[in-house]
C-alpha cells in the first residue's frame, strides 16, 4: 500500500516546519523502514532487549530536523518487547525530545504488535492503495472509525491514477499497509 513511502514523505515534510521529527521503525518482524533507509544494522530492538542502555546511540540523523531510529537486528519476541517497561520508558522519553514521531509497524490484523502500539499513539493512519481495496470493505473501515478504538483515525489514499476514471476499488494493501503517527505538537 506504500505505508513506508507515505510515512517517510510525511515525516520529511513535517521536518521542514521546522520541527524535530523522528521516524521510528517498530516493524520488529520485517523492518521495512530500516531497509528502505539502509539502516538495518543497529537499532531499537537492542535497547528494548536491554543489550544497549542508551537508545540515542542508535538514532541516525537523515537531514536537519529529521532522524530515524531503526529496528536493528530482528528480535525473536516482538510483542513481548512492545509490552515491556523499557518500551513505555522509551516512548515517554522520545515524546519529550521530538515534536512528531512517525511509527512504522505491522498491520493490525496480522500480528499483535500494532494493536499494542495503537494504545500509545496520538493518531492512527491507515494507508490504502487505489485499486486494491474493494469498495465493499468501506463499511468495515467506517465501523473501525466509529468504534473509537484508534486515536484520531485517518486514511491516506495512495497510488491514485488521476488519469483513470474507473471507480469501485480503493487502496488497501493487505499486509503491510498501516502507518502510525505520534506527535505532541499543540498545532495538531
Per-range role (PLM):
Residues 1-188:
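P-loop NTP-binding module
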